[in-house]
């Protein structure tokens, strides 16, 4: 570890951190905001269940599929260049969405927004790895994690307030303004950097991987409506498998691959990727499902929903920073596993809540989940760039962010499909049908009532039972993840405490 982390570091590095953190704030706002404003968007732009689901899915699909390519582009052509281009496209896409007149064009622009966000995130985080070293790097990435937490915490509240006061279009005008500020600051303060060993870009690998992940995500997103055994789902799944096999062959034969497959021989690298996926099913899915439940099933307003969601994400405001401050005393595996165990306990606790009970029965479990996930949250971004040489920071960021975001998109689709399946099982035939169960899972009570020909009380009861079962399954999955991640990230027995890798270690 560098004993003098500030030596040879650019003096404006904290201004660079401000630019990247502001860009990092835009990502969760772009993800959580439209979920709260979805009802208002639907009233204004129209669209069926499938088109409305793509308000979230289009962003997640393109964001996740573009991150690894964006990281490779950052290493090859310049991290600042990719960061600035991403922010410019983010500002433009937000302005276009604020002026959208129909749901199809809105969804298409959301896809562009996802690609733009991938470029900004990959370029920004790779730049941070170049200007910060040692303990300062750990602190910088903890601040970035806290910024993500602020966006997650206040995104629903901001979206609900803006939507109620000025309409949903104001949310995207706000995102455009934030993007412009980050763009100006980054252009002024960030130095250019690139991988000196990078030659030509691994275009075959980049294209094949993007196609594989796109087809996989697309298939999972179609499954709730078409069914897992339908040709519409089987065909893209088969294509994804074939493209992924081709990607592995390409990367093995490429001198400078986009993804160095040899890294997967190292347990800590694998552990970091598993950790990247863990929040998807323990926390992120709740950011979409809970607003749909509160607004569509329980009848809360957008501002009330934003206030309640603040309880889930408020711990992100402080705990990631505290985790970074004490990072040198504990192993990453121990801290991350402890957080996931707490999160699993909160999910099981939340499963006992039923509408009509005191708000404390709802908010305390949500607070517990938020506290638990905050512990690994402040470590993940720093860990991602600490397991590879600094010159491959863009690749590391791309891999980690791809696993994280693609995992979130796939988890959202699978969990949504699972909730619809559970709802259907709690509705006795002939009432139950797939379209009605999906509408109820999406929180669309009027449409579900019409499709299922049942009274609202019965539908709410079926939804509550299904949601309870879902939370138990998520708790069990999170518990298993805590154990597995501990085994991969915890120092082996042969290492002494002084030689064991710590959270702040960096090459």
Q: Model-predicted segments: where are they?
A:
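A membrane-interface helix-boundary motif in multi-pass transporters
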Residues: 164-174, 222-232, 301, 421-475
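Transmembrane-helix bundle of Major Facilitator Superfamily
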Residues: 2-188, 351
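Alpha-helical transmembrane bundle and helix-membrane interface signal
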Residues: 133-134, 192-197, 221-234
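Alpha-helical transmembrane segments and their membrane-interface exit regions
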Residues: 181-184, 240-246
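Transmembrane-helix exit segments and adjacent C-terminal regions of multi-pass membrane proteins
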Residues: 2-16, 20, 24, 382, ...
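Helix-loop junctions on the cytosolic side of multi-pass membrane transporters
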Residues: 184-203, 226, 249-258, 487-497
């Amino acid at each position: 570890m560098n004993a003098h982390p500030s030596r040879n570091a650019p003096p404006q590095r904290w201004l660079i951190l401000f630019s990247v953190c502001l860009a990092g704030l835009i990502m969760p706002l772009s993800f959580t905001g439209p979920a709260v404003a979805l009802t208002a968007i639907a009233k204004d732009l129209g669209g069926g269940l499938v088109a409305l689901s793509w308000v979230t899915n289009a962003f997640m699909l393109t964001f996740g599929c573009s991150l690894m390519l964006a990281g490779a582009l950052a290493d090859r052509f310049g991290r600042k260049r990719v960061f600035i281009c991403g922010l410019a496209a983010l500002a433009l896409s937000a302005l276009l969405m604020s002026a959208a007149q129909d749901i199809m064009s809105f969804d298409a622009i959301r896809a562009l927004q996802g690609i733009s966000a991938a470029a900004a995130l990959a370029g920004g985080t790779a730049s941070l790895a170049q200007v910060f070293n040692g303990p300062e790097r750990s602190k910088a990435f903890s601040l970035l994690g806290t910024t993500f937490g602020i966006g997650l915490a206040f995104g629903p509240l901001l979206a609900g307030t803006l939507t109620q006061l000025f309409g949903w279009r104001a949310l995207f005008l706000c995102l455009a303004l934030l993007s412009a500020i980050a763009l100006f600051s980054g252009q002024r303060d960030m130095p250019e950097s690139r991988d000196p060993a990078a030659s030509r870009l691994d275009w075959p690998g980049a294209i094949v991987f993007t196609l594989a992940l796109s087809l996989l995500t697309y298939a999972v997103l179609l499954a709730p409506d078409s069914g897992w055994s339908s040709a519409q789902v089987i065909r893209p799944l088969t294509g994804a498998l074939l493209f992924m096999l081709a990607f592995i062959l390409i990367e093995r034969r490429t001198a400078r691959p986009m993804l160095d497959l040899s890294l997967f021989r190292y347990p800590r690298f694998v552990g970091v990727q598993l950790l990247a996926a863990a929040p998807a099913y323990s926390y992120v899915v709740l950011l979409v499902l809970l607003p749909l439940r509160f607004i569509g099933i329980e009848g809360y307003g957008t501002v009330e929903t934003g206030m309640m969601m603040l309880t889930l994400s408020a711990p992100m405001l402080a705990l990631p920073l505290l985790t970074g401050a004490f990072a040198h005393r504990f192993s990453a595996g121990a801290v991350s596993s402890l957080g996931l165990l707490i999160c699993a306990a909160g999910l099981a606790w939340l499963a006992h809540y039923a509408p009509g009970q005191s708000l404390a029965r709802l908010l305390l479990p949500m607070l517990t989940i938020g506290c638990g996930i905050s512990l690994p949250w402040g470590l993940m971004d720093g860990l991602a760039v600490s397991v590879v040489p600094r010159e491959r920071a863009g690749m590391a960021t791309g891999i980690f962010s791809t696993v994280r975001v693609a995992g979130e998109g796939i988890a959202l689709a699978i969990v949504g499909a699972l909730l619809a399946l559970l709802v259907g099982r709690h509705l006795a035939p002939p009432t139950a049908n797939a379209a009605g169960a999906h509408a109820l899972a999406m929180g669309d009570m009027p449409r579900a009532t019409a499709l299922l020909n049942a009274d609202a009380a019965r539908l709410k009861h079926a939804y509550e039972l299904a949601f309870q079962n879902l939370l138990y399954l998520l708790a069990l999955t999170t518990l298993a993840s805590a154990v597995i991640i501990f085994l991969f990230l915890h120092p082996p027995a042969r290492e002494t405490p002084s030689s064991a890798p710590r959270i702040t270690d960096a090459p």
